[in-house]
Every structure is written in structure tokens, then in C-alpha cells.
């Protein structure tokens, strides 16, 4: 089949299926693609092609993820589905697959299970704003009352973790029946996508966020001044705008008097650009790798925060042994490592390889971080874990 043209007139939204093992996440993903393909809005995909998820690397961690794309009348979607529970945890914590909203799949035959709870919590921690629920396998439950009870249980669970349990849409259906072409259940897939279209909000575009660029390198141009290079993470910057140099040292304000990309002078730098910024009145020693250049007042340096972390298993190249309270690894933010200590939640003595835990981190130097900032945990340059900042402490 010919490649679908990328239609820029449609809003682009990133979604993903989450939920307990064997509740039907991958079958639902295949059903969405297949039902929409009948309207010419997607390529049909079978279960096997999605389940056979390719490996990718994010922050030094290997993750299996399937990416598929499809359209509705309103939007263009990128949809991620992971084969295993650990892949979900790693995906969310590394931010490898950004989600503007999630489709929570719950089997009506089982109701919410341990991983249902875990995925909802993780979604909240990494900042997934909204969730739509697909109640799967409804063809296997005869008792209407039973399905109603499962729905109530899901709403309570969503509310417990800070989602809007009262108003989240819950669509009843059967992904397998829809995939097999049963018209009644195909309509349920369209009903689900309609809920996703309306309930999951358009994301704030990276360009509309306040400017931020992590400094990768610094050099001096004789007679002109100091240039900091890096990739613009978000926002836009125009010539002669003020920026702050944040992190590692006291925050300092400067004006950008030149923007260069591929040896050409530009009037502005945009999210995604690799740019060199000429900084007025800044010495070579005032700015270093690991700091960020940001819109004044938009981000401040911190040393203490809470985080959700995933610790790599031995088989994934991680530690072979647990770590304890006096553990002091390096925390790699954007472009640099900073040493820090960890504090566990009450009652926890150690953290085992393969665990997903919440802990408090205290860095020895302040770094520009905010809720949602992602980092790697490293020992001597080797990645042993990944984390996402869930709450700023200091």
C-alpha cells in the first residue's frame, strides 16, 4: 500500500495503550488500525506485526516498542504499544514515547489488576494528562450488572491516582470481535476513537513552550565573544532576546547577539534546531556543558526532588546487586552528570535490579530541573537506571 501523506492540517497527537498483561492492548491496537483502514485512514495491521516490537534505545536503555500511525476524521495519531510490562515502565520513565493521552485497556472478565494500577500510577507520575478507558472482552460477560461494577471500580481507581474518574469516557467492546470484522464491535472501536478525539486534548506544541536549550559545548570566537552550542529542546528564540544561564553556578542573565546554524546566521532558533548562540558579555568560564539557556524566569535550579525510577536488571547491562541507603551514583541530566545521594521511602531497605521505585534524590550541585524532567542513573559512564522527576523538593 502507498504511504499515507502526512496531513499537516490535522492536529498531531501521541497516544498509547496501557493496562494489565493479556487484557488486550495489542489486539486493540490492531483493531483500531484495521477498523480505520476500512475508511482509508490507516494501514491495516495484524496482531503479530505489532506484537513483534522492534528494539530501540533511549537514555542507554533497550526498550521494545511498536509505533503505529493512523488518522481519524479530526486528527493524525502516533500510537505506541509495548509487548511487556517492563517495557512500559522503561518507556514512560525515559520518555522514549511521549503520550499526550492514554487508552487504558481493562478486561471485563478480570476487572482492574495489579499492572492496571501500576500503569495508572506511572502515567500520573510522568504527566500523562488524560485517560480514556476501553473495557475489553465484554462479549465474554453475560451479566450487565457485573460490567457495571467493573466500570465503577475503574472510575474509583482513576480518581485514587488523580485522574478524573467521574468523567473519563469508558467504552465497552471486544477488540478481538472488531478485528474479526463483527460490525457491532467495529462500531465500538469508532466510538472509542471518537472519545479519544474529544476527551484527549491537543498537546501544547513544543514551539509554544518557553525557550530552553541545554549547553553541549562552549567556545570563544576572537573579537566576537562566547558561543554556546546545543539542541533547542523547546520554544523559540529571536535575535537580541534575553536568556538566563541556569544550573551549576548562580543564574546569570545575558543577551543573545547572534544565532548560527550550519555556519549560517539566523534570525531565530526553533525547537529541534542545533544552534550556536553568541552571548553578550559572557566569559568562556561563565557557561559550561550541563547548564541550560532558558527564557528568564521559566526554569530554576534545584538540588532535591522526588523521582520515579527504573533500575536495570543484570541482563539489561545494569547492576548485579541491590543498592542501599548510602548509594551515590551520577545523575545524567540532558548533557551532564551530577553526583547525588538517594533516600528511600519509609520501610524500604534496598532497591533490587529490575525494580521500579520512588525515591528522593539530593544532588551535590544545582541543576535546571522541573516536574517531568528525565534523567539517567549512571556509574562510571554505564547506565544502570532511568528516572523522571515527579516532585521538586528544594
Curated annotation (Swiss-Prot):
UniProt-listed Enzyme Commission number(s): 3.6.5.3
Source taxon at top rank: Bacteria
Catalytic activity: GTP + H2O = GDP + phosphate + H(+)
Residue segments, region G3: 81-84
Binding site for GTP: 19-26, 81-85, 136-139
Keywords: Cytoplasm, Elongation factor, GTP-binding, Hydrolase, Magnesium, Metal-binding, Nucleotide-binding, Protein biosynthesis
Pfam families (UniProt xref): GTP_EFTU, GTP_EFTU_D2, GTP_EFTU_D3
Domain tr-type G per the UniProt entry, residue ranges: 10-204
Entry keyword annotation includes Kinase: no
Subcellular location(s) of the protein: Cytoplasm
Stretches for region G2: 60-64
Residue numbers spanned by region G1: 19-26
Chain residues that bind Mg(2+): 26
Stretches for region G4: 136-139
Function text: GTP hydrolase that promotes the GTP-dependent binding of aminoacyl-tRNA to the A-site of ribosomes during protein biosynthesis.
Alphabetized HAMAP family for the sequence: EF_Tu_B (MF_00118_B)
Family note: Belongs to the TRAFAC class translation factor GTPase superfamily. Classic translation factor GTPase family. EF-Tu/EF-1A subfamily.
PANTHER family cross-referenced by the UniProt entry: ELONGATION FACTOR TU, MITOCHONDRIAL, ELONGATION FACTOR TU-RELATED
Subunit structure comment from the entry: Monomer.
Record-given protein name: Elongation factor Tu
Organism: Mycoplasmopsis synoviae (strain 53) (Mycoplasma synoviae)
Amino acid at each position: 500500500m502507498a504511504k499515507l501523506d502526512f496531513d499537516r492540517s490535522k492536529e498531531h497527537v501521541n497516544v498509547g495503550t496501557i493496562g494489565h498483561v493479556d487484557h488486550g492492548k495489542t489486539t486493540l491496537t490492531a483493531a483500531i488500525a484495521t477498523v480505520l483502514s476500512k475508511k482509508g485512514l490507516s494501514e491495516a495491521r495484524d496482531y503479530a506485526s505489532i506484537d513483534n516490537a522492534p528494539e530501540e534505545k533511549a537514555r542507554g536503555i533497550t526498550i521494545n516498542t511498536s509505533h503505529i500511525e493512523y488518522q481519524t476524521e479530526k486528527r493524525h495519531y502516533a500510537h505506541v504499544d509495548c509487548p511487556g510490562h517492563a517495557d512500559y515502565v522503561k518507556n514512560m520513565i525515559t520518555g522514549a514515547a511521549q503520550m499526550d493521552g492514554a487508552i487504558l485497556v481493562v478486561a471485563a472478565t478480570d476487572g482492574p489488576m495489579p499492572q492496571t494500577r501500576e500503569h495508572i500510577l506511572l502515567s500520573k507520575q510522568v504527566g500523562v494528562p488524560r485517560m480514556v478507558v476501553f473495557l475489553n472482552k465484554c462479549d465474554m460477560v453475560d451479566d450487565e450488572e457485573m460490567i457495571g461494577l467493573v466500570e465503577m471500580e475503574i472510575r474509583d481507581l482513576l480518581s485514587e491516582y488523580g485522574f478524573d474518574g467521574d468523567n473519563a469516557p469508558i467504552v465497552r467492546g471486544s477488540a478481538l470481535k472488531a478485528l474479526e470484522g463483527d460490525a457491532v464491535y467495529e462500531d465500538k472501536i469508532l466510538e472509542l476513537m471518537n472519545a479519544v478525539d474529544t476527551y484527549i486534548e491537543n498537546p501544547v506544541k513544543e514551539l509554544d513552550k518557553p525557550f530552553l536549550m541545554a549547553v553541549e559545548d562552549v567556545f570563544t570566537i576572537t573579537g566576537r565573544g562566547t558561543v554556546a552550542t546545543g539542541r533547542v529542546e523547546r520554544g523559540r528564540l529571536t535575535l537580541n532576546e534575553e536568556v538566563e544561564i541556569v544550573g551549576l553556578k548562580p543564574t546569570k542573565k545575558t543577551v543573545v547577539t547572534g544565532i548560527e546554524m550550519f555556519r549560517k546566521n539566523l534570525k531565530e532558533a526553533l525547537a529541534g534546531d542545533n544552534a550556536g548562540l553568541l552571548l553578550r558579555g559572557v566569559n568562556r568560564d561563565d557557561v559550561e556543558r550541563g547548564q541550560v539557556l532558558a527564557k528568564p524566569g521559566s526554569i530554576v535550579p534545584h538540588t532535591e526532588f522526588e523521582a520515579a525510577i527504573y533500575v536495570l536488571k543484570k541482563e539489561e547491562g545494569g547492576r548485579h546487586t541491590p543498592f542501599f541507603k548510602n548509594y551515590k551514583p551520577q545523575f545524567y541530566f540532558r548533557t551532564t552528570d551530577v553526583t547525588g545521594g538517594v533516600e528511600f521511602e519509609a520501610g524500604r531497605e534496598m532497591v533490587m535490579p529490575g525494580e521500579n521505585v520512588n525515591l528522593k534524590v539530593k544532588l551535590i550541585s544545582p541543576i535546571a530541573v522541573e516536574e517531568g524532567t528525565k534523567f539517567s542513573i549512571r556509574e562510571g559512564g554505564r547506565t544502570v537506571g532511568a528516572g523522571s522527576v515527579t516532585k521538586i523538593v528544594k
